């Protein structure tokens, strides 16, 4: 997801709250 800590392979934030 877009909200959370760390970047995923797409360059967006991962780990939705």
UniProtKB/Swiss-Prot annotation:
Entry GO terms, CC:
extracellular region
Taxonomic superkingdom = Bacteria
Q: Which UniProt keywords apply?
A: Isopeptide bond, Secreted
Record's keyword annotation contains Secreted: yes
Q: Where is this cross-link: Isoaspartyl glycine isopeptide (Gly-Asn)?
A: 1-8
Q: Could you confirm whether the keyword Ion transport appears in this record?
A: no
Q: Where in the cell is it found?
A: Secreted
Where mainly found? secreted
What does the record give as the function of this protein? Answer: Competitive antagonist of atrial natriuretic peptide NPR-A receptors. It binds competitively to atrial natriuretic peptide (ANP) receptors from bovine adrenal cortex and inhibits the ANP-induced intracellular cGMP accumulation in bovine aorta smooth muscle cells. Can also reduce the increase in cGMP produced by ANP or BNP (brain natriuretic peptide) in pregnant guinea pig myometrium, but has no effect on relaxation induced by either peptide. Blocks the ANP-induced human sperm acrosome reaction without affecting the acrosomal exocytosis or sperm motility.
Q: What else is known?
A: Anantin has been tested for antimicrobial activity against a broad variety of bacteria and fungi, but no antibiotic activity has been found.
Protein's UniProt name: Anantin
Q: Origin organism of this chain?
A: Streptomyces coerulescens
């Amino acid at each position: 997801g877009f909200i959370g800590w760390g970047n995923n392979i797409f360059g967006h934030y991962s780990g939705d709250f």
